[in-house]
Amino acid sequence: MADEYLVPLDQYLAAGVHIGTQQKTKDMKKFIYRVRQDGLYVLDVRKTDERLKVAGKFLAKFEPQSILAVSVRLYGQKPVKKFGEVTGARAIPGRFLPGTMTNPAVKNFFEPDVLIVTDPRADHQAMREAVEIGIPIVALVDTENLLSYVDLAIPTNNKGRKALALIYWILAREILYNRGEIQSREDFKIPVEEFEMKIVRR
């Protein structure tokens, strides 16, 4: 059915995909479902799901190695790295070196055809360079983000460990499915836990 979720609604909720922040921007108003009594804005998971479907189809059109996914945020680093391994995309977890996309003298210089950012605010350097070279930007966006220069927004909790793992897992699966590399979504056998940043307890 066309209105079915990519994963059960309970799985989205358990991962906290819908949990926003206590700030909202005008840009994000259309993605907000409600505000809780404690002032926390809650995202509309249906819209998250819809955007993941669109993003999967869009990204599947690119050569795998021409996709760049980045995450300065700690909890996005393992998901981005695993996403790269699974889809063939280039991944930069951690610090994004200025000039990576714009300065051929930089050691790991790379000109992608599309950029995926985990958080427009944290990944602002990568976004700035993507705008400079004129490539589309797919962004995971929370309630306090702005959509300036974002071509395709995926509304989600972009700070939570489990939320980021689930979003990148779904996105990887959707890309493989839309490329025809798997015949059905059930053929994607990699557990979501492999996308999840582990907490090191001292």
Swiss-Prot record:
S-S bridge residues: none
CC terms in the record's Gene Ontology section: small ribosomal subunit
GO biological process, one term: translation
Record-linked Gene3D superfamilies: Glucose-6-phosphate isomerase like protein, domain 1 (3.40.50.10490)
Family to which the UniProt record says this protein belongs: Belongs to the universal ribosomal protein uS2 family.
Oligomer and partners: Part of the 30S ribosomal subunit.
Name the UniProt record assigns to this protein: Small ribosomal subunit protein uS2
